[in-house]
């Protein structure tokens, strides 16, 4: 069977949902609200229960005598009640909700009409028999109502009670299943007309009554005036106070009977806002027309003459308030100030007038106004003059992240727990650092590095014996010195890996220096012991020369011989790391807000700015507001070294985060703030300071460096744009290019950034005539098309030293070429031939080297160069040839020279470009 909801049943029978719910509960149905469903049979039961309750009651005939007695009884009872409750002064009626009353009356009228229709259908015969009695009774009721109308209108409260009784009666009447809107509209209109009629009739009778009272008061006053003048004056002053309503009514024109009109003109002296059907009238923006017929002549105006007083009288009679004396405030004993406080602020703090402080400053020789800022020295002198001990307020710089790393009270010693050691693997190029890390993590990351060089720092975490170890892998190339220095600053232990066959190399020495500068213990891993030429003892001896002495030799450095390729002695190396970490007692407070260091940063095309962070103290959570270097943001997502999403990062944990508005610099510190607003303010302030610092580094032209600046204009430059995959590579590449030393040419890095090569880079390169160098990145398809159209050169590389070589060659090519003279042969003139219109031909024999067609020639006579020029033609017998070898004969002509003589020496030479 189908089900129906309770509100559908209520809609069908014209009932409220609340009544349907109550009826259903009374019938024993389990329902909760109007949206509950019931079976079809239960729905019929509910409808039938309402049908039974609305059946009309039998009409009991009422005799004319009973009706007259009832009406007479009601009128007799109403008269003493009205007489007893009628006050001396008519009270102002309270506002009522007329709209709700009108709807209730209309609803009651509609239900009454419908019930009357049903009664007519059921009791048609009975109604026909009593038709005469009903008509006669209706006529009697109309007469009774007409007689009692005046008494009902005398008291407004009775009228209101009458409406309330009618409303209660209408509510008690049963309602039909359907609602007649036409009947409701007719009842509404009839009620409005009746209301207007009652108001009009009430006003008419009130006006008549006021007129009679005014005439009586006037006649009484006239009689009293004839008897005694003082008594009249007293009565005249008392009359307006005793009857303010009556006197005010006289000023209005005589009331007219307007009962036949739908709405009479409202009485301006009374408030009829309660009779407005939609509530009180809003007369805020309407003009006041209560006295619109009065003459408004300003010169002859006599309004309020009795109450007017002259200015002199008002001034003399005014009660002058005594001047309140200012309370004397004691000066404070101490005053905490900030530099730049104004005079007004100081006056407010010490409870003194600004004029007093300005006067004191003037006596001290300082000209100031109350809105002028004062420096610290002036404020202290002023406080000394007042006898107040002044001390400057120490303001905490919220933009200073470094304070979290040096403040002792930031960490709670009671909450300190043991943390994982951070280990940095350092060593020379291709000594096996990434291979060792690959062996530790059981992955093949090492094979993916180009040229055997780790291009950027990687941070990984492994577990050994139930304890975690965090590893940082640093590049070995000389260009990545700054990255190795950053790695040493955040590490706890350094693993110095040295190849057993190569020994100590330049980057090995550099790694030792970084570790010693950071005061980090060194564990030496001698790698490649599986090779035939391995000599670990030689490595130990070489390291001892640089201060890294083995514990076997009485030093403090642990030495472990390993083979990263075959995994030999790896467990021993990890145990050594944990042993050194245990000696150091590494601890962190996980309860504070997280602080740490940026290991690496890059710009991802889909994710935006991505930063690899190492949490050093506290715990980093997703959605934490964070300031990283000179940028800020909120941690949107966080992934660990395995690429898995995590929500929490404990101390010594490397994570990669997204949500920053820019890519930070590698090595920057980060800190979590209490809310995003504070983080934004700190980040913007740090960015502003960095920009200001960068501008201050810009050199200005002065008389001292003017000559150097003009001379620098002669120096040519190679403009380059650097784009790399990570920030560390960008820094290293830019630093390496700037170090290239080619006389007369310098490198100018126009722009460097992280991310793929895009259209804006092409536009910038075209405008600045620059070469774009992409390091481990590729141009977008749109950028590639634009580069081809604009003829912009893009060089893509994955190994840094190849980039350096290529740029160095380009720099050398920008210099003007230098040539040197190279003598390739000599010849002796044996005979000369003069040909008309051609010139002099010299027959020669090559005595040394060779004579070529494109070479230059000098004519030497008696050891003196008489001419230097180019060959016009070269022949061997009658054939034109390119060269004539040693011992051969030939003929030649020299451009613009015909004075060749026998025994002249011809020296052939070429100009060769000197390679730089």
Swiss-Prot record:
State the gene name recorded for this protein: infB
May I ask which residue range the UniProt record assigns to the signal sequence? none
Taxonomically, the superkingdom here is Bacteria
Q: Which organism is it from?
A: Streptococcus mutans serotype c (strain ATCC 700610 / UA159)
Pfam families in the cross-refs: EF-G_D2 (PF22042), GTP_EFTU (PF00009), IF-2 (PF11987), IF2_N (PF04760)
Gene3D superfamilies tied to this protein: 1.10.10.2480, P-loop containing nucleotide triphosphate hydrolases (3.40.50.300), Translation factors (2.40.30.10), Translation initiation factor IF- 2, domain 3 (3.40.50.10050)
HAMAP family attached to this UniProt entry:
IF_2_B
Q: What is this protein called?
A: Translation initiation factor IF-2
Sequence positions that bind GTP: 427-434, 473-477, 527-530
One example GO MF annotation: translation initiation factor activity
Residue span of region G4: 527-530
* Listed PANTHER family: TR-TYPE G DOMAIN-CONTAINING PROTEIN, TRANSLATION INITIATION FACTOR IF-2-RELATED
Q: What does the UniProt entry say about where the protein is found?
A: Cytoplasm
**Region: G3, residue numbers:** 473-476
Domain tr-type G stretches: 418-585
Q: Keyword Cell cycle on this protein?
A: no
Region (G5), start-end ranges: 563-565
